[in-house]
Design a protein with these regions (language model features):
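Solvent-exposed, acidic/flexible segments
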Residues: 27-31, 35, 64, 102-110
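Local sequence-structure signature of Cys/Sec-based thiol-disulfide redox active-site neighborhoods
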Residues: 13-46
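N-terminal targeting signals for export/organelle localization
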Residues: 1-5
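Thiol-based oxidoreductase modules, predominantly thioredoxin-like and allied folds used
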Residues: 50-66
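Non-catalytic, surface beta->alpha helical segment in thiol-disulfide oxidoreductase systems
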Residues: 83-124
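N-terminal leader/targeting and pre-domain segments
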Residues: 9-15, 119-125
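Structural micro-motif
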Residues: 66, 71-86, 90-92
Length: 125
């Protein structure tokens, strides 16, 4: 699902693409597994992009007061993995609810995340 945001509900960033894993303070085993698989996939596949600042990985605790706005910014229902493309004009975000179905299928999980991040990184600024 791809949604557009108004410019008023995003935070400026050097990175053109940000990957968020939104979670709560108390997390189940599957929540921790999604966080771990996402982190490892991004670090292994996009090391250079993370290093040079074109990509950011942001696990974010929604229970912290400073992060509650994300619930509205990205229309979050629960713990979610979200890829945000920020061209400086109109941020676009993709929620990945299918991670819950793929949590025990690491190859498919990683492939889905890699494909979406590559697609977003390939977009012109």
């Amino acid at each position: 699902m791809q949604l557009h945001l108004s410019a008023s509900c995003w935070l400026p960033s050097v990175a053109a693409v940000r990957v968020y894993y939104f979670h709560r303070t108390v997390r189940c085993g599957d929540c921790l597994r999604i966080d771990q698989m996402s982190s490892e996939t991004l670090k292994e596949t996009f090391h250079q992009e993370l290093t040079d600042g074109h990509l950011e990985w942001r696990p974010t605790n929604l229970d912290l007061p400073e992060n509650t706005h994300f619930m509205f910014d990205y229309d979050l229902n629960a713990n979610e993995l979200v890829v945000v493309r920020d061209d400086g004009k109109q941020p676009v975000f993709n929620k990945l609810p299918e991670v819950w179905e793929l949590v025990y299928h690491p190859a498919k999980f990683c492939s889905m995340l890699i494909d979406l991040v590559r697609e977003q990184l390939a977009q012109p600024n």
